Amino acid sequence: MAKKDYKAMAAGIITVLPFASVSLPLLLVFLAGFGMKAGLFPMHVWLPEAHPAAPSHVSALMSGVMIKTGVYGILRVTAALGEQPLLHTAGVILLAAGVVTGLWGVILAAMQNDVKRLLAYSSIENVGVILIGIGIAALGKASGNQFVALAGIAGALLHTANHSFFKPLLFFGAGNILSATHTTSLDSLGGLGRHMPLTALLFLAGTAAICALPPLNGFVSELLIYLGLFDGIASGSDTLASAAALTALALIGGVVVLAFTKLYGTVFLGSPRTHEVAEASEADNHRIAAMALPLAGILFVGLFPRAAVAAVTRAADFFLRTPADAADWLLSPSLAAAGRTAWLLAAVVALLLWLRRRLLRGRRIARGPTWGCGFTSPNEKMQYTGESFSEGLQSIATSLTQNSGEGSPVPKSEIFPGAHSFDVGHRDRIGRLFSAWWVELLRRINARVMRLRTGKINHYVLFALAFLALVFLLSVLNLI
């Protein structure tokens, strides 16, 4: 099929769908269905359970590609609304859903003590960021603000692509860690930077990208969303919604840095906490190559933001359904400055690494234990754990989680305590309530439906005839 035929087919999708008179309940049904696929709060409960159970390369595919089909569906439905008044309502709903999903995902991510569960909740947070972009784009389109609409949708589309680069890299890294140590528990890992230097370096690039630090790709897409939110405030249209989303996006960014500083520091820095971790070795070349390939995309988007935005503006034009002055947007001072800043930072980092290597050349580097404030016999048990690293956030957000602890208590009569253990876990309180309610609802529906299972063929023929009669009636009334 020719390229132009694909464009015609894409345009025809909107033409044939009955969205011209779509109602709010129908819109909510579409958003709920696609939102469940994307991991939208509170329908995200399946995602943190699926990623730890799946092999790491499957988790990379699920997070990088599969959940994006839900985002694609939401984008299609929003684009199909055209210029009707419901578009503004859809924008507000998407903006609110994105804020709640992003905050919920990142707070729960920062509390996790398992590498893959942390990355899974981070995927929920990134879906929230994408929905913030789509929401502000819908508000800009509804109010006629071309800049806000284009910045929001370009940022959302680019962040969708960016997440498909850095999240598979991180999941591949988690697979390397699991293969080398046979665990993904943060409280069992540590010091892997010495044993797995290439994995540590590539994983560091992925954490910097997901934290939206320049000169990497996450910075560019979130910059576009920020520009749309700032312009939405400055233009006076939907000021309150834009300001609230801007505040939430900044808060999300701060907690992301906390979560991934905890992840990288606990896993790769410090000392090994177990014998298996101390005996870990670097992954083979194929596994390293699997991490390096997404890094190429991360660097390309970060260092060439104008080219990356050019790749998504065609889709942005399709969303806007009106001719967009993409050339002026690509040449905007903010985006050009982002490119210059990225190259400047890359040059500074390269220069510092070169100076460090040159200054240390030929010198003996002494290694010793971390200074313990006068204590001369520190051990690996005295390091920060994943639990202690995020204790401050846990004390603030304790109502969001269902905490559990299992261990053996220390008797008061035991003057010199022996070996004891205590395991702490954090579960998603709202997610567990929602899943319990959903399972109970399905159980009751199934119990009622099972009454129709009589085992008599004449009853089943009657059901089929009744269904056909219902379809005929709805067709006559022009309801389907």
What are these language model-derived features?
Residues 61-67, 123, 287-294, 458-463:
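Select subsegments of transmembrane alpha-helices in polytopic membrane proteins
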Residues 167, 254-260, 346-363, 402-406:
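Hydrophobic alpha-helical membrane-embedded segments
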Residues 31, 204, 256, 292-300, ...:
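Hydrophobic alpha-helical transmembrane segments of multi-pass integral membrane proteins
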Residues 241-254, 279-298, 302, 310-311, ...:
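Polynucleotide-recognition surfaces of large bacterial nucleic-acid defense/processing enzymes
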Residues 305-342, 356-480:
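Aromatic-capped, Gly/Pro-kinked transmembrane alpha-helices
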Residues 98, 206, 287-301, 317-325, ...:
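Hydrophobic membrane-spanning alpha-helices of multi-pass integral membrane proteins
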Residues 203-215, 290-309, 399, 468-470:
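Hydrophobic alpha-helical membrane-insertion segments
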Residues 1-282:
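Hydrophobic transmembrane alpha-helices and their helix-loop junctions in integral membrane proteins
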